[in-house]
């Protein structure tokens, strides 16, 4: 029977499937951070249980950490309690921890792949909604709740219903300067923030295959923003080249065997998807969100939408509410929208490729008056590589702040928050009301678009001189 990539990985991980019951699947990798793990560890202690597979559990500190200091004294009392609790729990249960002093510490969805923890054909879970990032490697990766975190800790399994399958093909080649972030925002703009609900999405097509692993991670990272359970991309030579030699990747003869096995992880030619979406790559322009969800997105050369153009009353009301919150007027050119904050970072866009793209627009320029711009590398290794290439100096000379790794301004959970009324060009993944701080307005863009906005003081079409 012909199978999709998702179905192959799913079937390989079924431990038990009782009649009329959701199957139990095996979990190969469990990624843990300081926010969603304390209650799970406590549950194990109360029940007197051990951690089932400490060697398959990896922890880091990222959500609440400071990006200005590696000292615990820089943390709020709650944040300090969380990171200290994670440290104690990892020591007690034998979990490998990348703490704030470790050179490999970073955002869980950045440091996992770069260490080779993420491998094709595996099932990966984490108490974080953007776990879909790891699907870029042909893994089945999805976020879970705290009670499920405890269940995985205790059993290394999960009870899960099988999802429907969706193919999203990005046909042809994108124009010069169009990034993975533009591709995925264009996809979400087409199918909406709930268009993938109930599905595991496989991204494919020439434009997807041409992406680096960093770009593929950006695309899969935002699968959840279209409502999907997970996003996946079939592994290929690009995948293998990225993984070879990384710390937790197979070595020697095991490597050759793994690469051979990974070559089978692709959708069969005659497999049938439950839904198919096709996007023409040539039609994708630089994208940015205008509203309060990632589906409210337009191209840089388009106008802020007019709610009167919406025939669906629910959509019309949604547009009206979004415009009121973000304080924009229908019909405004997006290039006329000014910003006063810029955030380059997050599990979506904080890898070395992202920082290089942003540095191109920062080099030899200055951050505009009245604009505060911060650059937050996704991990210690990304920071080290960027500094070796001199990217930090480019940003600093242009007036950007160069920070320590962490989730930072993606979410208002640490000290990197926006103030009421701030308008931010952000490379993160969510532009919900208050996501970056109470009363703040977020516009999702690529790293290049964010850096260009920082120096211009407003959004610009990076395809043209500015």
Swiss-Prot record:
Q: In which pathway does it act?
A: Amino-acid biosynthesis; L-leucine biosynthesis; L-leucine from 3-methyl-2-oxobutanoate: step 2/4
What are the UniProt keywords, alphabetically? 4Fe-4S, Amino-acid biosynthesis, Branched-chain amino acid biosynthesis, Iron, Iron-sulfur, Leucine biosynthesis, Lyase, Metal-binding
**Cofactor: how and how many bound:** Binds 1 [4Fe-4S] cluster per subunit.
Q: Name one GO biological process term.
A: L-leucine biosynthetic process
Identify the residues that bind [4Fe-4S] cluster.
347, 407, 410
- The parts of the chain that form a coiled coil are none
> What Pfam families would the database entry show?
Aconitase
Statement: the UniProt record of this protein carries the keyword Lyase: yes
Which of the seven top EC classes does this enzyme belong to?
lyase
Its subunit composition reads:
Heterodimer of LeuC and LeuD.
Q: Which NCBIfam families match?
A: leuC, PRK05478.1, PRK12466.1
* Protein family according to the UniProt entry: Belongs to the aconitase/IPM isomerase family. LeuC type 1 subfamily.
Q: What is this protein called?
A: 3-isopropylmalate dehydratase large subunit
